[in-house]
């Protein structure tokens, strides 16, 4: 992959952060002065790590803590697989493609276009595992279900407007007695329209075929990144499964301060509490497994033969923007600091996933928006800009040979 990008597509000037980021920053600054809080029934701190979702104790895990329930679920998946999804080699080994989708807001249009272009190239595999955070969490279930849902991704990421995601109320009122500057009712309705009973059933079917879908959220109470086993939720048969599935997607895309947190009912020792969850990007900008099961589990395949992993990461953002002088003002400086910190976090996540790949003998490939693509735009969700990013992603994927095979600064190896 050429990290310098293709020929110029537009004026490559790096703009300030989106309106959402501005709202979040303004809110954070004002809230530092201290305002009243809304009542809640939070989990006592000493019980936080023991909290589970009622009737579904095996659907999530804390990142960085191997979880026996999620590991057993993954181990069971190898016997459920269809040979048509993951053909066996002559020696009995199997290659497992994984897809990790990053956050990035409206820039998810790039990832949606890339997936569609990948399909048109004829080389898009069936993924064993799909993960997502933030906008990647909105994309992940559709990517998991495969090319049949490419058109849904295209529609969402080329026609959605800001008003389809959130609405602003009285900012002063929200700062004084609220918990966010915007109302995400429109986004919740959008998720509800696309993720219905039939959709959930298809997720469950793929889970029972040995494939796995994970979404990450940030638990603000526990200060931890949480990995949710979405296929297990879908396949649980519980009456609350559909609502829970939708809530996890919404939570992972709920930018703190700008958007309201999402509350999950949990229990400890028979008593009910609530947990406050926000955008998964707070905990990780992109993740593969979150350290919730043993790395060797794919190699071992439950004793069914050797497994090899092929890791694909789509960064729904521009990791290498061209320099752009910062205005000498408090908001401009603060916004640029947040922007730079976010990009640094992505680099760290790429190195972490790459390190896993090196240890496990897996292939590693990733893609980002080329640095000379113009990211200008005043509206947070602008169909014109998003259609342009969709087209960029589609063109790159359809052309093939677009992947980088090592993190920034590392020697690039030929793609397998």
Residue spans for each PLM region:
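N-terminal secretory signal peptides that target proteins for export/translocation
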Residues: 1-19
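Sec-dependent signal peptide recognition
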Residues: 19-26
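C-terminal motif of bacterial Sec signal peptides marking the signal peptidase cleavage site
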Residues: 31-34
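Patatin-like phospholipase
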Residues: 36-129, 144-416
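Gly/Ala-rich beta-loop-alpha elbow adjacent to hydrolase catalytic centers
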Residues: 131-132, 136
């Amino acid at each position: 992959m050429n990290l310098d990008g293709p020929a110029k597509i537009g004026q490559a000037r790096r703009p300030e952060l989106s309106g959402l980021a501005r709202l979040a920053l303004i809110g954070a600054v004002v809230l530092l002065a201290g305002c009243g809080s809304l009542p809640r029934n939070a989990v006592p701190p000493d019980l936080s790590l023991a909290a589970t979702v009622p009737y579904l104790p095996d659907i999530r895990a804390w990142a960085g803590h191997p979880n026996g329930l999620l590991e057993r679920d993954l181990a069971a998946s190898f016997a459920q697989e269809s040979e048509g999804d993951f053909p066996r080699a002559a020696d009995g080994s199997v290659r497992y493609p994984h897809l990790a989708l990053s956050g990035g807001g409206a820039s998810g249009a790039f990832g949606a276009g890339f997936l569609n272009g990948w399909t048109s190239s004829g080389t898009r595999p069936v993924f064993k595992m799909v993960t997502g955070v933030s906008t990647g969490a909105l994309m992940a279930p559709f990517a998991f279900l495969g090319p049949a849902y490419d058109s849904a991704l295209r529609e969402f990421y080329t026609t959605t407007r800001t008003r389809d995601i959130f609405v602003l109320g009285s900012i002063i009122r929200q700062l004084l007695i609220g918990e966010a500057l915007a109302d995400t009712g429109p986004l919740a309705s959008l998720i509800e329209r696309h993720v219905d009973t039939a959709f959930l059933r298809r997720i469950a079917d793929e889970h029972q075929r040995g494939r796995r879908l994970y979404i990450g959220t940030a638990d603000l109470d526990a200060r931890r990144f949480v990995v949710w086993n979405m296929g297990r939720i879908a396949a649980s048969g519980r009456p609350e499964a559909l609502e829970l599935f939708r809530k996890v997607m919404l939570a992972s895309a709920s930018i703190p301060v700008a958007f309201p947190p999402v509350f999950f009912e949990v229990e400890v020792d028979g008593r009910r509490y609530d947990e406050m969850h926000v955008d998964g990007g707070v905990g990780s900008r992109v993740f593969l497994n979150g350290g919730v099961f043993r790395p060797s589990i794919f190699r071992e395949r439950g004793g069914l033969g050797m497994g090899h992993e092929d890791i694909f990461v789509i960064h729904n953002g521009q990791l290498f923007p061209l320099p752009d002088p910062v205005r000498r003002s408090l908001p401009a400086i603060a916004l640029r600091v947040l922007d730079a910190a976010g990009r640094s976090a992505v680099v760290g996540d790429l190195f972490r996933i790459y390190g896993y790949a090196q240890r496990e003998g897996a292939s590693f490939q990733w893609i980002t928006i080329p640095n000379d693509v113009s990211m200008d735009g005043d509206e947070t969700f602008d169909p014109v800009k998003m259609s342009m990013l969709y087209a960029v992603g589609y063109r790159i994927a359809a052309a093939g040979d677009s992947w980088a095979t090592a993190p920034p600064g590392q020697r690039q190896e030929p793609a397998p």
